[in-house]
Amino acid sequence: MRITYLLLSLVLCLCPVMQAQNTTNQFMKQAQSSLEKKDYTKARYLFLQAYKSLSQQGDYKQAIDAGTQAAYLYYCENYYQEAFDLCRQMNQFILTEELKLQKSLYEQRFQVTKERLEMYIKLKNAAQAQVQLNTLDNLASQAGDEKLSNNLLYTQAGYYYTFGQNEQGDAAFQKL
């Protein structure tokens, strides 16, 4: 009798967790599908819902992936304020997760900062873009991750070419 109650309790406890994960997966699948169909408003909404759900579950990697997708879709439609607000929310979420995990999440910080850099590049704000580029450089150095370093070099090259600094862009590509 006690075993039956124990099993029933266990199933009832796990059911909402599995349902939340399924809902999040549905958000991501539907968002990708909407993106492929070029329904950007719906895709943005679904990526935002996935970000919120994943951040509540503490899945920081997938949450930041979904959040940066939503931010990208915001600023592609010139909703810069919303995109910057979302980036601030993601930075706060990363900080909370770093405190909880007692480790630095360089890759996620890099991802959000790079998205912010792309916004400044699209706005043709070279000064703020340079600040973000310097932040990316610091994050890549602190992380000591070759993948981030290569991503940084590629990003630097794009930045330099965008703002007419072709020699520096060529130098960044040579380092790759």
Locate each region found by the language model.
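Positively charged n-region of N-terminal signal peptides that target proteins for export
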Residues: 1-5
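Bacterial N-terminal signal peptides
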Residues: 7-15
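A "functional boundary" signal
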Residues: 19-176
